[in-house]
């Protein structure tokens, strides 16, 4: 039956840009990719997008620890993430970042519309403040006991056990994650999104029947407990977008993160020009379909805040949320010590992507159930299903076709009714892919694979090949087996992209959903090459060991300049503005009699001379070599009386000290007296 082509926009939750992709992440991206690939096979216009979630205090602090800018860190992490997803053949049309101009503009637009419509409220709140670090503590930098279910060691914004959201001030026995100190309360003006104003709309959306039953039930609990206004602002220091007309206030990461879906799509539209319209997908009355694949830990944000923000700013709401559970490994939470906290890149060093794609797909359903990656079962299932049932079907027939018939298939089907049984299954299997009942689809396909192999066993082409005068029978039997293999691989194409490429090369034809209605008759296939190799537990053992070694390496003491000389506590811009840095010309440099550490520098500031003592003698044993160089000095440092005279400032140098100290110099063109800005 011909389907009407639909316009579909699909997203995955945005990975946070401060860590590597691991097998927990990959469940969602594989699930979405399988669904997207099926939709494309059915002729729908699908735009599949994602981005890195690149804002927040965790990124700011980690960048400080690494001694790089947040922009540099998120740029490097984006490349790593995209490499990992490409390695697993996730077919994104666009991968972007929330730290983008598109996202800034859309965040400001949505905020301004919400404000104009009266949905932004200002009020002063008491906020947790780290007295040791001198900073307000973001939600994720406070931990304590959940005020709802009393689970310990929960973050300050939501509980990973019961899913509740709350204010950090509601935590029981809170502690600063940054310093371990007990936070104190400080007042600060914050901006709030008036979520309760959307309660009626959200309840109607929940009752529409579009959402998973488990999601709808959970939302009903939240409605019954009452919706609260949502704090959408954070105080400096913070890495993110500053709120318009509110100096020192920034959008909370969870405000601009989902807008990142729109930002990534806008970036894609700009790349493609007129071929894709942003408004066609995001306008209020859009007929395009919008689906978010997310984990169960972020349902609250996507089912309440996000649709309310869109409604309040005159954009369309999602068609549906597709929510999945967590990943466990060998029946337990992923563990670094056991080597089961496995990065995506580590997996790809030991196994191919199709193997994990198949295993996850075989276990997924439309329910929000956790998926266990049992590594022994993984090996057995991949070998039993992909190798023994599917690939073996091709290999045991292709040899005869290639050797005895020059690769040409029979002109008629040996068993048309059996072939019809296979093609008739397209409706059931297609519906399973469509409804995300992936495990059911795999079971249906493997049942067909069993039928196909039973047919070959019963026809025994290896026996027929030895019997004189039965060449036509041999060709018919093996051609039938290869045609059944083609149908199976067509059904598996959304799951196994790399195996599909090899199968298409052998079959000498593209695998399409509707194409299986016409079998390959009198068709020439290519010489058969091994399509897939068996895997074994030795590979699993090597994978686990490699993961353990990565953890050990990451836990090793950090060495280098930052470890030896950590970054000082954060200062305000006003503090920094007090320091007056100027370009200075070194007119003279000489040893200081009686000191084995100091040099006396005569500096020209462009009309004013300064005398400065600097402890750089060990690094510059020939002071005359410094004469004529430009350097940077602190020009407004109070004069300091020393045994050898008065020092009227300080020159800037880098390094640990002694011989390893390096005088800073400005770029060519800087003049004495120029202010460093």
Swiss-Prot record:
One of its GO terms (molecular function) is metal ion binding. Is required not only for elongation of protein synthesis but also for the initiation of all mRNA translation through initiator tRNA(fMet) aminoacylation. Residues 575-677 form the tRNA-binding domain. GO terms for cellular component: cytosol. CDD domains: Anticodon_Ia_Met, MetRS_core, tRNA_bind_EcMetRS_like. Its cofactor is Zn(2+). Its EC number is 6.1.1.10. This is Methionine--tRNA ligase. It catalyses: tRNA(Met) + L-methionine + ATP = L-methionyl-tRNA(Met) + AMP + diphosphate. A motif ('KMSKS' region) lies at residues 333-337. Binds 1 zinc ion per subunit. Transmembrane segments: none annotated. The lineage of its organism: Bacteria, Pseudomonadati, Pseudomonadota, Gammaproteobacteria, Enterobacterales. ATP binds at residue 336. The keyword Ligase applies. It is found in: Cytoplasm. The gene is metG. Keywords: Aminoacyl-tRNA synthetase, ATP-binding, Cytoplasm, Ligase, Metal-binding, Nucleotide-binding, Protein biosynthesis, RNA-binding, tRNA-binding, Zinc. Zn(2+) binds at residues 146, 149, 159, 162. GO terms for biological process: methionyl-tRNA aminoacylation. A motif ('HIGH' region) lies at residues 15-25.
């Amino acid at each position: 039956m011909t389907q009407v082509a639909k316009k579909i926009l699909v997203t995955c939750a945005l990975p946070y840009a401060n860590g590597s992709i691991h097998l927990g992440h990959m469940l969602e991206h594989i699930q979405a990719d399988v669904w997207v690939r099926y939709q494309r096979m059915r002729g729908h216009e699908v735009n599949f997008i994602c981005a890195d979630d690149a804002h927040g205090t965790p990124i700011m602090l980690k960048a400080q620890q690494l001694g790089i800018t947040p922009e540099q860190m998120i740029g490097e992490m984006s490349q790593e993430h995209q490499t990992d997803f490409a390695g697993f053949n996730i077919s994104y049309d666009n991968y972007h970042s929330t730290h983008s101009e598109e996202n800034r503009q859309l965040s400001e637009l949505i905020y301004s519309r919400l404000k104009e419509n009266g949905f932004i409220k200002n009020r002063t709140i008491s906020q947790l403040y780290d007295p040791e670090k001198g900073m307000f503590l973001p939600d994720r930098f406070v931990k304590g006991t959940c005020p709802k279910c009393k689970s310990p060691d929960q973050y300050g914004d939501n509980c990973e056990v019961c899913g509740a959201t709350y204010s950090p001030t509601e935590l029981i026995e809170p502690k600063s994650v940054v310093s371990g100190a007990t936070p104190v309360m400080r007042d600060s003006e914050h901006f709030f999104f008036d979520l309760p104003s959307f309660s009626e709309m959200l309840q109607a959306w929940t009752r529409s029947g579009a959402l998973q039953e488990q999601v709808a039930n959970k939302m009903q609990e939240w409605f019954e407990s009452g919706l609260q206004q949502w704090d959408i602002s954070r105080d400096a220091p913070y890495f993110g977008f500053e709120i318009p007309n509110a100096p020192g206030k920034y959008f909370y990461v969870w405000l601009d993160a989902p807008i990142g879906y729109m930002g990534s799509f806008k970036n894609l539209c700009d790349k493609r020009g007129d071929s894709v319209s942003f408004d066609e997908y995001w306008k209020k009355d859009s007929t395009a379909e919008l689906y978010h694949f997310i984990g169960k830990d972020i349902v609250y944000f996507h089912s309440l805040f996000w649709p309310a923000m869109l409604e309040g700013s005159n954009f369309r709401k999602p068609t549906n949320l597709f929510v999945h559970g967590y990943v466990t490994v060998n029946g337990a939470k992923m563990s670094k010590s056991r080597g089961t906290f496995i990065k995506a890149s580590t997996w790809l060093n030991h196994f191919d992507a199709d193997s994990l794609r198949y295993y996850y797909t075989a276990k997924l359903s439309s329910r929000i159930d956790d998926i266990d990656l049992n590594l022994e079962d993984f090996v057995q299932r991949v070998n039993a299903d992909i190798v023994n049932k599917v690939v073996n079907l091709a290999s045991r027939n292709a040899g005869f076709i290639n050797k005895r018939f020059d690769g040409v298939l029979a002109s008629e089907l040996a068993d048309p009714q059996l072939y019809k049984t296979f093609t008739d299954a397209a409706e059931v299997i297609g519906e399973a892919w469509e409804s995300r009942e992936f495990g059911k689809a795999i079971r249906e396909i493997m049942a067909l694979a069993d039928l196909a192999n039973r047919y070959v066993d019963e026809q025994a082409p290896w026996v027929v090949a030895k019997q004189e005068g039965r060449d036509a029978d041999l060709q018919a039997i093996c051609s039938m087996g290869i045609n059944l293999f083609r149908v199976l691989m067509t059904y598996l194409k959304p799951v196994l992209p790399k195996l599909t490429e090899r199968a298409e090369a052998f079959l000498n034809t593209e695998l399409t959903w509707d194409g299986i209605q016409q079998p390959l008759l009198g068709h020439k296939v290519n010489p058969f090459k091994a399509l897939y190799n068996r895997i074994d537990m030795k590979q699993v053992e090597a994978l686990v060991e490699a993961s353990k070694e990565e953890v050990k390496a990451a836990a090793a003491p950090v060495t280098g300049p930052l470890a030896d000389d950590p970054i000082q506590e954060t200062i305000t811009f006003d503090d920094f503005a007090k320091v007056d840095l100027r370009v200075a010309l070194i007119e003279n440099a000489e040893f200081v009699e009686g000191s084995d550490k100091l040099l006396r520098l005569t500096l020209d500031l462009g009309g004013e001379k300064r005398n400065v003592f600097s402890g750089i003698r060990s690094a510059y044993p020939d002071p005359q070599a410094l004469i004529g160089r430009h350097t940077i000095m602190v020009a407004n440092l109070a004069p300091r009386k020393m045994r050898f005279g008065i020092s009227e400032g300080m020159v800037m140098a880098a390094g640990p000290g002694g011989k390893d100290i390096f005088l800073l110099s400005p770029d060519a063109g800087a003049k004495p007296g120029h202010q460093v800005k």
